[in-house]
Amino acid sequence: MASKKREVQLQTVINNQSLWDEMLQNKGLTVIDVYQAWCGPCRAMQPLFRKLKNELNEDEILHFAVAEADNIVTLQPFRDKCEPVFLFSVNGKIIEKIQGANAPLVNKKVINLIDEERKIAAGEMARPQYPEIPLVDSDSEVSEESPCESVQELYSIAIIKPDAVISKKVLEIKRKITKAGFIIEAEHKTVLTEEQVVNFYSRIADQCDFEEFVSFMTSGLSYILVVSQGSKHNPPSEETEPQTDTEPNERSEDQPEVEAQVTPGMMKNKQDSLQEYLERQHLAQLCDIEEDAANVAKFMDAFFPDFKKMKSMKLEKTLALLRPNLFHERKDDVLRIIKDEDFKILEQRQVVLSEKEAQALCKEYENEDYFNKLIENMTSGPSLALVLLRDNGLQYWKQLLGPRTVEEAIEYFPESLCAQFAMDSLPVNQLYGSDSLETAEREIQHFFPLQSTLGLIKPHATSEQREQILKIVKEAGFDLTQVKKMFLTPEQIEKIYPKVTGKDFYKDLLEMLSVGPSMVMILTKWNAVAEWRRLMGPTDPEEAKLLSPDSIRAQFGISKLKNIVHGASNAYEAKEVVNRLFEDPEEN
């Protein structure tokens, strides 16, 4: 991997308009890598540029530069774009643009333009009159609106209450919001604490039933939504017919959002307000709307502290796979690079591929002579499958991988993972990555199918301990599909603890679980039953402190009976208990 020093020597750094204007004074050809501050220049192309610089040996007429679109007015159309863009400037005029890290095309273009410059200098040809191309990103060319419309975006907060979550109204409410022309900018699923409810609803604290309201709002999951009116908001219609599953205005839950610029003008006209629309749809009792600037800021600080910082980010999941030979010989080297490149490994597992699975992952090679050998190799032993998460993760992983064959990688992308981890056993890339977000979703679901299990926080847990446990659960990658506080009946306890009903301590267990409400949860992720049991730790807190000191029982357990949490023993038991405690348990 090239050092920063070498990169600067090879490419002039342009990070403001003044340096851009200065670059346009260059004589001859300047190849400009236009990049975003959050992802940096396209490192995969730097070996090609170094090769061209050395082989052409034309320092007077061949220059390379990297330009940060964020801080250069001229490059405004390329801001917040994921794909690399390369501009070709000849004597200060931008005459060509190539999108994507297309090494062969860039290589050919540079060689042809330098050949022209040599002939012009030798008097063998007149300078061609190339038209200067407009600096408009292809994604913007079909848009009728300016990408920099100065429209003050307005934000409000929608709080979908626990009873709406339990009754599975969340999806309906979100669809209504987006159907009305509003945009759901961010979403956070949480169990509100008493302190948060008292703080956020201080305006009604003097009402006689406020204590009961606080108890209700802390009894289960709430959804906190950041909603913007958008630059084009059509007044909501009265129609209430159901909408399709497509929600174009709603962002993915994996994508973090941004802190709002709260202004006194945040209150919308009443006829355009989200509050009035939800009232007309008979949903206002299930969803509170907050538009007061100060209160919106409170919610932002509490639930979306990185909202502004993450505004331009695009978190994506992708499937990565190390083929058997690479997994066996250099797994640790690959994992180190993955972490160094700021990927988060959400899940990983060893898997021996079936012939059908191998053929699906190697479809791009099916017409090659070595296809059968490749399938044989792919099914010969365990591969390592990973779910990776990163800003622009899918494209960034594909860029790191490089070409599909070792031959092309070594010639054009010697620093790609394909070239770095080439092996004699196969002429193809030893690593795999999904080719689209749709494919990634399908492949992740195949190799890491979701599973749900029962989680229970016992009555003796304090509110602070419950809050800490929920935080640990989320950080472990579990989705809180459903949560509710409930007083368990003896019949329900018997279902939750089917293996201990005849034990001597069962009476003590019944008594302990009857002293107050338990927090009952449906926890969802891949391999959820085993992962939740691992996170809980051994039944005895003293044993847990020795064997699993970071486990929940080691941190919060008091005794075998009061060991703070419980979980199902197996998938069958989990399904039985969840069905008994939650009617028609499914995610909102």
Curated annotation (Swiss-Prot):
NDK 3: annotated span: 456-588
Enzyme class: hydrolase
GO terms classed as biological process: cell differentiation; cellular response to reactive oxygen species; cilium assembly; flagellated sperm motility; spermatogenesis
Chain coiled-coil ranges: none
Annotated segments matching region NDK 1: 157-257
Keyword Coiled coil in record: no
Cysteine pairings via disulfide bonds: C39-C42
Region (Disordered): 230-261
Tissue occurrence: Testis-specific. Expressed only in primary spermatocytes and round spermatids.
Segments for region (NDK 2): 315-455
Keyword Chloroplast: no
Subcellular location: Cytoplasm
Any one GO MF annotation of this record: 3'-5' exonuclease activity
InterPro entries: NDK-like_dom, NDK-like_dom_sf, Thioredoxin-like_sf, Thioredoxin_CS, Thioredoxin_domain, TXND_domain-containing
Record-listed E.C. numbers: 3.1.-.-
Entry keyword set: Ciliopathy, Cytoplasm, Developmental protein, Differentiation, Disulfide bond, Hydrolase, Primary ciliary dyskinesia, Repeat, Spermatogenesis
Assigned protein family: In the C-terminal section; belongs to the NDK family.
Function: Probably required during the final stages of sperm tail maturation in the testis and/or epididymis, where extensive disulfide bonding of fibrous sheath (FS) proteins occurs. In vitro, it has neither nucleoside diphosphate kinase (NDPK) activity nor reducing activity on disulfide bonds. Exhibits a 3'-5' exonuclease activity with a preference for single-stranded DNA, suggesting roles in DNA proofreading and repair.
Disease per record: Ciliary dyskinesia, primary, 6: A disorder characterized by abnormalities of motile cilia. Respiratory infections leading to chronic inflammation and bronchiectasis are recurrent, due to defects in the respiratory cilia; reduced fertility is often observed in male patients due to abnormalities of sperm tails. Half of the patients exhibit randomization of left-right body asymmetry and situs inversus, due to dysfunction of monocilia at the embryonic node. Primary ciliary dyskinesia associated with situs inversus is referred to as Kartagener syndrome.
Subunit record text: Monomer.
Domain notes: Contains 3 inactive NDK domains that do not possess all residues considered to be crucial for the NDPK activity.
Listed name of the protein: Thioredoxin domain-containing protein 3
Protein's gene: NME8
